[in-house]
């Protein structure tokens, strides 16, 4: 199950996955659902984090229902500072360092060069796990998937040979041929991105 806590980000719902939208102030309802669920992902919007953590503090040991707190960070200075604040907030309410995992998002080439503030902070405070191998590299696929409303999984499962369609249908309309060309390219991108995501997952939860 995926729970989106007032997330203003492009959540899984925008990629065709079923998402349970919830308000941050309804933490007790979320806690009950977590207790009843075997597997769940909670996507907390930045603007809802403080209220979410407040609700967690009010229900004793509720954080025990959450195995990991995964924090994605982008390289801009503001994003890094917000991530540091989030790690500090989690540490202050007693979340163990090994449960706080940082994912470096939209990496251009080198995590150490692009995320110095986060890396230096975690190295000093030792209150989270920040492995430079947990890096999702910048790729145009994510925007394209959002626009088409499909997931990487659905794209990879699509067995259509779009290259063959282009080759074998020279009289098809320009619109059809353009669509087939797009899909062929997206499938190639998806294979590369999927390898990257599998590697990040293995790094985070090894």
Language-model region placement:
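C-terminal accessory extensions appended to soluble enzyme cores
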Residues: 174-206
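Short, glycine/acidic-enriched loop or turn micro-motifs at the edges of active sites
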Residues: 9, 46, 108
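Phosphate/oxyanion-binding active-site loops and adjacent basic polyanion-contact surfaces
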Residues: 23, 45-49, 78-83, 193
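Conserved catalytic-core segment of NTP-binding enzymes
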Residues: 50-147
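Switch II (G3) loop of P-loop NTPases
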Residues: 37-56
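Beta-strand-loop-alpha "switch" segments that mediate conformational coupling across diverse proteins
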Residues: 121-181
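Glycine-rich, highly charged phosphate/nucleotide-binding loops
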Residues: 20-31, 51-56
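Walker A/P-loop NTP-binding active-site region of P-loop NTPases
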Residues: 1-24
């Amino acid at each position: 199950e995926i729970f989106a806590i007032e997330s203003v980000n492009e959540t899984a719902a925008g990629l065709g996955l079923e998402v349970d939208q919830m308000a941050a102030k309804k933490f007790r309802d979320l806690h009950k659902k977590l207790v009843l669920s075997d597997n769940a992902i909670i996507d907390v919007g930045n603007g809802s984090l403080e209220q979410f953590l407040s609700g967690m503090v009010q229900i004793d040991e509720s954080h025990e229902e959450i195995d990991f707190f995964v924090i994605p960070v982008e390289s801009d200075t503001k994003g890094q500072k917000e991530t540091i604040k989030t790690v500090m907030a989690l540490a202050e309410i007693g979340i163990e360092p090994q449960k706080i995992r940082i994912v470096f998002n939209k990496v251009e080439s080198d995590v150490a060069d692009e995320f110095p503030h986060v890396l230096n902070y975690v190295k000093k405070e030792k209150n989270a796990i920040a492995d430079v191998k947990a890096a999702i590299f910048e790729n145009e696929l994510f925007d394209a998937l959002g626009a088409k409303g499909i997931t990487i999984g659905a794209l990879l499962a699509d067995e259509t040979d779009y290259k063959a369609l282009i080759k074998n249908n020279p009289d098809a309309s320009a619109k059809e041929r353009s669509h087939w060309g797009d899909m062929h390219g997206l499938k190639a991108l998806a294979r590369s991105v999927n390898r990257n995501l599998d590697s990040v997952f293995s790094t985070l939860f090894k």
